[in-house]
Each structure stands twice: as structure tokens, then as C-alpha cells.
Amino acid sequence: MKLFQKKNTTKAALLLAACFSALPALASGFPVTVDSCGQPLTFTAAPKRAVVHDMNMSEMAFALGLQPSMVGVTGITGWYKATPEFKKQQGNIPELAPKYPTLENLLAANPDFFFAGWNYGMKVGGDVTPQTLGKYNIKTLVLSESCIHVDKTRPRASMDLLYGDMLKLGKIFGRAEQAGKLVDGYKQRVA
């Protein structure tokens, strides 16, 4: 009888351990859905292989400490002179293309996420769009201020759009609280 109880106790302990090990995944807030140019974009987990286009979007990612999840940046040296601080934050993250990335540039890095905008890494009718990348299971967060290039009813660039994109990026990567604190700090500096 004691052997039977011991086996059942062991099974119960293993079952409880399995249940509790799943709690961090639930507590992290996934799945999450954000708006990307009027389209819902859902993540069941934070991206692990992100590519970010343009210096400003890269700086947003760096501010959230996303470097460990980044496999590339694009559109830096072809348009800008990177500061020593930017280069330090970029670290060993390679630049995949100095200006606009090609589909081949991106696929070679095997990303699961691309943060770019219309006329900021993507061109209407080009090879790199949310639709073309979606065929390769690459989710694209479109910079909100660029949505006006594909939908004239969308709002023009504003600080609120920038704040919203930072909050979306934080939510996607499981860093919503950190993003909220950054946005609050930005708002205080601008006020």
C-alpha cells in the first residue's frame, strides 16, 4: 500500500511541477496582438530572431534591450553616420544591407520578425512587404507613421505614434512594463 501511495505522490508532484513550469509562459502575457497599419499581428511568444530597419527603429529596439533577440539591422550605413554610442549598442549585430534590404538579405538571416516601415525598408509593390515576408513566417511590425504611405486616412507622424510603436514593441517582446516606463520618461522630457 505504501508503494502505491508513494507512486501516486510522485506522479502528483510531477504533474504539479509540469503545471507550475507552464505558469511563466502564461504570466509573460502571451499571446499578444498589436495593430500593424490596421492589421492585427499576433505573437504566441516573443520573437527570437529579429531584424530591425533604420537607425531610429534600431534605437527603439536598443532602448528596450532587444539586442539578444536581434540577428540583424538594415538601412544604417547607407543613410547615416553611426555614432560611437550606436555602434556600441549594436555590438556584434550585423548590418544585412546598408540601405533597403532585399528578400534574399532577410531570408539569409532566418528572422522571425522584421520592424520596418513603408519607405523605411519596404516599398509598395517591392520584394519586401508584410505579405511577402509572411509567406516565410516572418511577422512584420510596420512603423505607424509610415502607414500613411499606403492609406491616406491614417494619421501623420506624431509623438503619439512614436510612443505607440514603442509600446507595441515592448508588448511583442514581453517588455511592456519597460516600454511604458520609457514612454513615460519621453513624455516628461517633451513636456
Q: Where on the chain are the PLM-derived regions?
A:
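Extracytoplasmic substrate-binding proteins
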Residues: 30-33, 40, 129-191
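Sec-dependent signal peptide recognition
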Residues: 7-15
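N-terminal hydrophobic signal/anchor transmembrane helix of membrane proteins
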Residues: 49-67, 149, 159-168
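A short, structured surface patch at a secondary-structure boundary
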Residues: 52-109, 113-121
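Extracytoplasmic
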Residues: 29, 36-38, 45-48, 52, ...
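Bacterial Sec-exported substrate-binding components of ABC uptake systems
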Residues: 2-4, 16, 20-60, 171-191
